[in-house]
Amino acid sequence: MAKKSSIEKNNRRRKMTKNAAPKRARLKAIIADKDLPMEERFAATLKLAEMPRNSSATRIRNRCEITGRSRSVYRLNKLSRIAIRDLGSKGLVPGLVKSSW
């Protein structure tokens, strides 16, 4: 089980990213637009740099919804391999069958 502080920190980052996404997208579009004057693009770069680091999507870590584990997490269902195995052995994951040969 991951530390609660790590899980909460990641959740805060998700919220910040969601709130700041439109503003970041606008600033990035201004920076990428070669038709605008250089001063305006540079000002947009400075505004983007002033935004909080945690509002960037790269700072988000994929974590298991059940355990908070950060490694070996499947994006499709947001569960770690260990959680999938436990739920599968209890029969709670539809279509998951223990292999035998």
UniProtKB/Swiss-Prot annotation:
Please give the biological process terms from Gene Ontology that the record holds: translation
Key word Ribonucleoprotein present:
yes
Q: What InterPro entries does the record tag this protein with?
A: Ribosomal_uS14 (IPR001209), Ribosomal_uS14_bac/plastid (IPR023036)
Keyword Ribonucleoprotein part of the UniProt annotation: yes
* Start and end residues of each stretch annotated as Disordered: 1-23
Composition bias type Basic and acidic residues, residue spans: 1-10
One GO cellular component term noted in the UniProt record for this chain: cytoplasm
Which residues fall in a compositionally biased region of kind Basic residues?
11-23
Keywords assigned by UniProt? Ribonucleoprotein, Ribosomal protein, RNA-binding, rRNA-binding
Recorded GO MF terms: rRNA binding; structural constituent of ribosome
Query: Pfam families, from UniProt?
Result: Ribosomal_S14
Protein function: Binds 16S rRNA, required for the assembly of 30S particles and may also be responsible for determining the conformation of the 16S rRNA at the A site.
The family line of this record is: Belongs to the universal ribosomal protein uS14 family.
How is the quaternary structure described? Part of the 30S ribosomal subunit. Contacts proteins S3 and S10.
Q: What is this protein called?
A: Small ribosomal subunit protein uS14
Q: Which gene encodes it?
A: rpsN
